[in-house]
Amino acid sequence: MAAGPALVLASASPRRLDLLAQVGVTPDRVDPADIDETPLRDETPRRHALRLALEKARVVAARAPGDFVLAADTVVAVGRRILPKAETEADVLYCLKLLSGRNHKVLTGVALIAPDGRAATRLVETKVGFKRLSDAERDGYVASGQWRGKAGGYGVQGLAGGFITDLQGSYPSVVGLPLYETLNLLSGLGYRP
């Protein structure tokens, strides 16, 4: 019996691989998309997350014709302000200053392209409350380095989990991939593990 189309994960995130494994989905290969993630002028956080997820999926689908391609992008926003993926201490300090003592939104866009070219997307929005951070908490978190490469400068599954006062929505989405919605996309477009 011939194998069906492969599932390609268009992400280098080990967290997304771990989340998929939790629900019994193992991509056949990982092929990260390297795209410009700069927000467009006047782009809302919702549109930004969906656009990036779909763009990543399309870039990888062009390299993997006939396969399923799954991509996601997670955006942290305070109001309409999209926070960066923290790469420097200045980035994380900027993010923590905006997040401290406030609620914010974590939006994860998910895109799936089927072997026949059909595409489907989902957006999951989660409201997250952050405690007011003391200087010692902020400095300790910065020193930990756990913020590197994370949207909004934090990962809920690490030390920053202790800063979360409230989470309304999808915990896996805040980590990087909403599992319920992802499984529905996969089954809806005909993926069978």
From Swiss-Prot:
<dbReference type="Pfam" id="PF02545">
    <property type="entry name" value="Maf"/>
</dbReference>
<feature type="site" description="Important for substrate specificity">
    <location>
        <position position="74"/>
    </location>
</feature>
<feature type="active site" description="Proton acceptor">
    <location>
        <position position="73"/>
    </location>
</feature>
<protein>
    <recommendedName>
        <fullName>dTTP/UTP pyrophosphatase</fullName>
        <ecNumber>3.6.1.9</ecNumber>
    </recommendedName>
</protein>
<keyword id="KW-0546">Nucleotide metabolism</keyword>
<keyword id="KW-0963">Cytoplasm</keyword>
<comment type="similarity">
    <text>Belongs to the Maf family. YhdE subfamily.</text>
</comment>
<dbReference type="GO" id="GO:0036218">
    <property type="term" value="F:dTTP diphosphatase activity"/>
</dbReference>
<dbReference type="InterPro" id="IPR003697">
    <property type="entry name" value="Maf-like"/>
</dbReference>
<feature type="site" description="Important for substrate specificity">
    <location>
        <position position="15"/>
    </location>
</feature>
<dbReference type="GO" id="GO:0036221">
    <property type="term" value="F:UTP diphosphatase activity"/>
</dbReference>
<comment type="function">
    <text>Nucleoside triphosphate pyrophosphatase that hydrolyzes dTTP and UTP. May have a dual role in cell division arrest and in preventing the incorporation of modified nucleotides into cellular nucleic acids.</text>
</comment>
<dbReference type="InterPro" id="IPR029001">
    <property type="entry name" value="ITPase-like_fam"/>
</dbReference>
<feature type="site" description="Important for substrate specificity">
    <location>
        <position position="157"/>
    </location>
</feature>
<dbReference type="GO" id="GO:0009117">
    <property type="term" value="P:nucleotide metabolic process"/>
</dbReference>
<keyword id="KW-0378">Hydrolase</keyword>
<dbReference type="GO" id="GO:0005737">
    <property type="term" value="C:cytoplasm"/>
</dbReference>
